[in-house]
Amino acid sequence: MAWRITLGLFISLLLSFAALADVGVGFQQITIVKGADNRPLDVAVFYPVSSSSQTTIIGENAAFPGITVSKNAAPESGKYPLIVVSHGYGGSWLNQLWLAEALVKQGYIVAAPNHPGTTTKDMRTEKAQELWLRPHDISRVVTALLAAPEKTGRVDEKRIAAVGHSLGGWTVLELAGGRFSAAQFEQDCLTHAGLASCKVYERMQVAKNAASRTQLDKSLADPRIRAVVSLDMGLARGITAQSLAAINIPVLIMAAGYPNEELPAALESHDLARKLPPAHSTYKEIADATHFSFMQRCKPGAIDIINAESPGDGMICLDGGERSREQIHQDVAQDISEFLRAAWRKP
């Protein structure tokens, strides 16, 4: 009987996702100012709307394509699961537009904040060094959207997840219950000084006094987060094995498999994944994905355009095989969707 009920729920979910195949993508930008952190958050929110809503394109420029959205459109009725996306160091909510679009079309609300101090147009060291506030940013977004269903749709409070790329991967693992140890990480960097994580950590000037080390070493878990997905995370070697073993929500760890001496899967994502409880964790390495394959697609000629503005940064358009980035994105989005559907079925 239990099996039949589970199968029935699964079929129901599949039908509901299929029914949303032609749904439009609503879009709003909000600012969250409440809080004691003096840390206003710029947040992009994407949500299901009627496919007949008026549309425009956002996120497009000479280097990157955008997506089609309906700005400030009224949300569809009903409850929807919420996914909050955390960008990497120096990134922004634009980096995972492709994922937001794919998830909204499957019936999710997706929210993505710009993290102060580590986002494209705000790289202030004094904000970046408050690394422990990154997970809190995600929690603030959850609180804000739960409190205002009339704006972007009603959130199903039992189906809330977080997805993070690079430093965002560290952010969501902290929300799941991972505990960072500044002492452990700094000791490890003496052995692995060439890792990008060690370089970024030093650039952010993290944990330079006792007070900040105490804040960073605290638990930053949010029990409202019921599942997390990490996309080629950094700073993994600072999360304690004891805290990883105690995580009791579903975790999907995805890694770029294309060789990268500065962010090797073997020392970052895979090393972390083997410390998670196998009963509710999944690890997948994508052989032809680079670290930047999880970011937005690039237009033809984008490498030259980006290099002209910022020499060397055109590398963000490079993938590791014959597949296009769009094909990689399709597979990643499918993996995430399947993982989340399974996570929602767990008691």
Regions found by a protein language model. Give the residues of each.
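Domain-level recognition of soluble alpha/beta enzyme cores
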Residues: 22-85, 105, 265, 302-303
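Short amphipathic alpha-helix adjacent to the substrate-entry channel of hydrolases
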Residues: 76-80, 91-114
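The conserved beta1-alpha1 loop
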Residues: 81-88, 232, 255-256
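Catalytic nucleophile-loop/oxyanion-hole region of alpha/beta-hydrolase
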Residues: 90-102, 119-140
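Alpha/beta-hydrolase active-site loop
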Residues: 127-153, 157, 170, 174, ...
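Short beta-strand/loop motif that positions the catalytic acidic residue
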Residues: 247, 253-255
